[in-house]
Amino acid sequence: MTLKTLKRVIRITKQLLKDLEMLLKQTEGLGINIYTHGEMLPSHGYEGLKKYKHLAGNFGGAWQDQQKQFDNLPGCILMTTNCLMRPRDTYKDRIYSTNVVGWDGIKYIEKKPDGEKDFSEIIKQSLELGGFTEEQEAKEILVGFGHEAALSHAVELVEAVKSKQIRHFFLIGGCDGARPGRSYFTDFATMVPDDCMILTLACGKYRFNKLDFGTVAGLPRLLDIGQCNDVYSAILIANALSDAFGTDVNGLPLSLIVSWYEQKAVADLLALLSLGIKNIYLGPTLPAFLSPNVLQYLVDTFQLRLISNPEDDIKTCLGQAV
């Protein structure tokens, strides 16, 4: 498929869907197309946002590629939460921030006492910019498997496990980064056996979410649960499956392969540990704040593991000899 030729474009990035909704309302009918970026990708799975026809698609990937990607965008950018890198001079005059994110020299959009925001300045500038002048090639991917959507297939998932059509679930996701070692997560996903299902969330998904994983038991093998905040959805899905099988989450055929980077990942990891979830694989590095004693406690109590190599880790998850 190709994207429409765009006269004007605004790209909105990071997590806050409320900002996206306000922007869509204020740009409706103005000839501006809105593209998501980064962790705004899951917004295309929400009916309340999909109803806006000028929510045109997703442009770009994880946060660490933003400087190159924003360079090539003939429009404005709205940054709604963190992971803002130093803006280059080539786009510094057309990037805006709001909420807790900002940078010296870029424009900031305040929230009004009633919670609303006035995006008129970024809208005005986007109308003045040329936008895309020719068709842009695009690829369609499947999103929108938060807990409500995923659990609407709970009966099928349970039956597929009981009939051995699905052998194992792998949750592969978390924060992405630019340092070496993160190709592990791409390699891991591509090595997962065909009779296993992959769940993913957060910007770590961009390591493999454009690959074709096919189907298993009549369902997509890759289910995109959402943003890093949506670890909550992953927990609800795991709890529902554990109830169906009469076990706890640790008794499920489920392995968590988490890519580690920054503070939101801290909250996600602590949430999982607070629920007693064990055997989490973490990498490519461990959190810097873990002292040797704390790390040993987590290893002894929760069997927290540092990733090794994809092939051996998959075998361990599946209970095979390494």
Segment roles from a protein language model:
Residues M1-V322:
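Anaerobic metallocofactor- and corrinoid-dependent redox/one-carbon enzyme cores
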